[in-house]
């Protein structure tokens, strides 16, 4: 069901067929934001796992931006707004225990969400561990600083060993915080969530999903 967060940001929320669940999940999309791929993911997780699941748009009011424009606009995003929307989405689930996962830029914000203290578990898929130079702005903090301010042990991160957005030295830094990291040999950026992408690796994707769902369920 499409709804709006207090900020006005569009969100999708789905409860399991039995009604609202005591366990919830927030999903932060990749840089391209809300679209049928994520509507389907939210519904699938709600039905298969029995969780109340909410997702929201990263670029509210600018949904028509193409990928090049979104990449260029990364520096205009502010942590206070995005993380405020993440917390509001958690509240929208009505759940007692809430995890969070995200992809690409959304994964970066999952790491930053550690500092909010709102979420019980954090699962970034190929989220940037340091803010890319082209996205640095006055409202952007560093994910590693957020991890230092919260419970880094609540993080299970999924990364591809060939992903230029998460270079090995950054992944080492993430692991040193106490986060658990799953490194997939030969995998590039975006290898899990979108089967239409050339980078998709069905075997690795299935393994990553199994591990992430287990992490969120504990």
Briefly describe each language-model feature range.
Residues 150-151, 157-159, 163, 184:
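Short beta-strand/loop motif that positions the catalytic acidic residue
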Residues 65-75, 128-152:
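Flexible "cap/lid" loop of the alpha/beta hydrolase fold
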Residues 179-218:
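C-terminal catalytic histidine-bearing segment of alpha/beta-hydrolase fold enzymes
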Residues 58, 123-132:
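Active-site nucleophile loop of the alpha/beta-hydrolase fold
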Residues 100-102, 125, 158:
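Short beta-strand immediately N-terminal to the catalytic nucleophile in serine-hydrolase-like folds
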Residues 1-95, 192-193:
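Serine-hydrolase catalytic machinery in alpha/beta-hydrolase-like enzymes
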Residues 102-106, 110:
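Gly/Ala-rich beta-loop-alpha elbow adjacent to hydrolase catalytic centers
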Residues 164-170:
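Conserved alpha/beta-hydrolase "acid-adjacent" motif
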């Amino acid at each position: 069901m499409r709804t709006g967060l207090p900020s006005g940001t569009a969100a999708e929320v789905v409860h399991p067929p039995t009604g609202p669940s005591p366990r919830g999940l927030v999903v932060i999309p990749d840089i391209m934001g809300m679209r049928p791929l994520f509507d389907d993911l939210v519904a699938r997780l709600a039905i298969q796992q029995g969780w109340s699941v909410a997702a929201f748009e990263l670029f509210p009011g600018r949904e028509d931006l193409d990928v090049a424009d979104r990449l260029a606009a990364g520096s205009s995003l502010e942590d206070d707004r995005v993380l405020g929307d993440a917390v509001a989405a958690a509240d929208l689930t009505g759940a007692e225990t809430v995890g969070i996962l995200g992809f690409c830029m959304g994964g970066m914000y999952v790491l930053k969400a550690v500092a909010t203290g709102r979420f019980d578990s954090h699962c970034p898929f190929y989220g940037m561990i340091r803010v890319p130079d082209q996205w640095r702005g006055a409202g952007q903090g560093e994910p590693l600083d957020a991890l230092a301010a919260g419970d880094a042990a609540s993080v299970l991160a999924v990364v591809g060993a060939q992903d230029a957005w998460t270079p090995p030295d950054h992944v080492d830094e993430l692991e040193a915080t106490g986060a658990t990291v799953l490194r997939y040999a030969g995998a590039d950026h975006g290898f899990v969530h979108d089967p239409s992408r050339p980078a998709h690796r069905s075997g690795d994707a299935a393994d990553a999903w199994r591990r992430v769902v287990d992490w969120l369920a504990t």
